[in-house]
Amino acid sequence: GCCSLPPCAANNPDYC
């Protein structure tokens, strides 16, 4: 998922 991918997690702090 997004939160396991560092760039995605970094871009979605509220979600992750």
Swiss-Prot record:
<dbReference type="InterPro" id="IPR018072">
    <property type="entry name" value="Conotoxin_a-typ_CS"/>
</dbReference>
<feature type="site" description="Important for inhibitory potency on alpha-3-beta-2/CHRNA3-CHRNB2 and alpha-7/CHRNA7 nAChR">
    <location>
        <position position="11"/>
    </location>
</feature>
<dbReference type="GO" id="GO:0099106">
    <property type="term" value="F:ion channel regulator activity"/>
</dbReference>
<dbReference type="GO" id="GO:0005576">
    <property type="term" value="C:extracellular region"/>
</dbReference>
<keyword id="KW-0872">Ion channel impairing toxin</keyword>
<keyword id="KW-0008">Acetylcholine receptor inhibiting toxin</keyword>
<feature type="modified residue" description="Cysteine amide">
    <location>
        <position position="16"/>
    </location>
</feature>
<keyword id="KW-0800">Toxin</keyword>
<feature type="disulfide bond">
    <location>
        <begin position="2"/>
        <end position="8"/>
    </location>
</feature>
<feature type="disulfide bond">
    <location>
        <begin position="3"/>
        <end position="16"/>
    </location>
</feature>
<dbReference type="GO" id="GO:0030550">
    <property type="term" value="F:acetylcholine receptor inhibitor activity"/>
</dbReference>
<keyword id="KW-0528">Neurotoxin</keyword>
<feature type="region of interest" description="Ser-Xaa-Pro motif, crucial for potent interaction with nAChR">
    <location>
        <begin position="4"/>
        <end position="6"/>
    </location>
</feature>
<keyword id="KW-1015">Disulfide bond</keyword>
<keyword id="KW-0629">Postsynaptic neurotoxin</keyword>
<comment type="similarity">
    <text>Belongs to the conotoxin A superfamily.</text>
</comment>
<dbReference type="GO" id="GO:0090729">
    <property type="term" value="F:toxin activity"/>
</dbReference>
<feature type="site" description="Important for inhibitory potency on alpha-3-beta-2/CHRNA3-CHRNB2 nAChR; interacts with a hydrophobic pocket between the two alpha-7/CHRNA7 subunits or between the alpha-3 and the beta-2 subunits of alpha-3-beta-2/CHRNA3-CHRNB2 nAChR">
    <location>
        <position position="10"/>
    </location>
</feature>
<comment type="function">
    <text>Alpha-conotoxins act on postsynaptic membranes, they bind to the nicotinic acetylcholine receptors (nAChR) and thus inhibit them. This toxin blocks mammalian alpha-3-beta-2/CHRNA3-CHRNB2 (IC(50)=7-68 nM) and alpha-7/CHRNA7 (IC(50)=253 nM) nAChRs. It also shows a high inhibition on alpha-6/alpha-3-beta-2-beta-3 (CHRNA6/CHRNA3-CHRNB2-CHRNB3) (IC(50)=11 nM) and a low inhibition on alpha-6-beta-4/CHRNA4-CHRNB4 (IC(50)&gt;500 nM). It interacts with a hydrophobic pocket between two acetylcholine receptor subunits. In vivo, inhibits Ehrlich carcinoma growth and increase mouse survival.</text>
</comment>
<dbReference type="GO" id="GO:0035792">
    <property type="term" value="C:host cell postsynaptic membrane"/>
</dbReference>
<protein>
    <recommendedName>
        <fullName>Alpha-conotoxin PnIA</fullName>
    </recommendedName>
</protein>
<keyword id="KW-0765">Sulfation</keyword>
<keyword id="KW-0964">Secreted</keyword>
<feature type="modified residue" description="Sulfotyrosine">
    <location>
        <position position="15"/>
    </location>
</feature>
<keyword id="KW-0027">Amidation</keyword>
